[in-house]
Amino acid sequence: GLTGSFWLALLGSLIGAAIAGVLIEIIIIRRLYRRDHLDQVLATFALILLLSEGVRWIFGAFPLYLNIPNILNGSIPLFFEIIYSKYRLFIILIGLLIAIGLYLLITKTRLGIRIRAGQNDRQMISALGVDISKLYTIVFAIGAGLAGLAGAMIGAIQSVEVGMGEPILILAFVVIVIGGIGSIKGAFIGSILVGVTDTIGRVFLPNLLKVFMEPANATSMGSSIGSMLIYILMALILIMKPSGLFGKN
């Protein structure tokens, strides 16, 4: 980058993604609100493909890397003699702060009240004088900005490249289905359940299977089964609660 500053990169990604989100919402998504949800989903998938190929054509497909700042480099001792990366702890902390901030925004502010009302009955809130289009644009900007921030933070662990968010897309849908559509609490609990289930499956299953088979086969099979556990969890929750853990009936 021009400055090499990690913190400016985070800020720039947040602002840049929010601006892009506003433009996409105004130009494309706003025209689809009165249509079926499937049309909206298909349109956003088409946008993913178009934007990915556009970025690849303009900037190339070479991955870019962010340097972790010195203050977040290295590891820190935790309980039970566990050594953990400072930067990963930083990501966890930022995630928790964002979750708390979103919860307070939705439940404790006038904007949050309008967002919830607009979700339930857009005609009613429009009749009360609230500009529902502006409200949706704000929501889209917040979501896009947070997505950009997340991409920048993960770029210091992996790399920033075209399609880096696509593997997360399916997991995001799983989190929403498990937690319940429209629930901030559900999204938070669902993301924790998915993360813990995936980690336990990938870490403990291979070690357990090594007791019964060759280490190489155990590692491969354990990782595969670990990935399946997320979808098994989703299926079980949907059987018991079709609307998700905190979704509306």
Features from the language model and the residues they span:
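Helix-loop-helix "hairpin" substructures at the membrane interface of multi-pass membrane proteins
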Residues: 81-164, 184-189
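Short, charged juxtamembrane terminal tails flanking transmembrane helices
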Residues: 243-249
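Hydrophobic core segments of alpha-helical transmembrane domains in multi-pass membrane transport
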Residues: 14-20, 47-55, 94-103, 144-147, ...
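Alpha-helical transmembrane segments within multi-pass membrane transporters and channels
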Residues: 4-47, 54, 189-194, 198, ...
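Transmembrane helix-bundle core of multi-pass membrane transporters
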Residues: 31-32, 37-108, 135, 203, ...
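Amphipathic alpha-helical segments that mediate coupling or scaffolding at interfaces
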Residues: 31-35, 118, 152, 176, ...
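Helix-loop interface residues and adjacent transmembrane-helix termini in multi-pass membrane transporters
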Residues: 3-4, 34-35, 108, 119, ...
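Transmembrane alpha-helical segments in multi-pass inner-membrane proteins
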Residues: 3-15, 137-147, 151-231
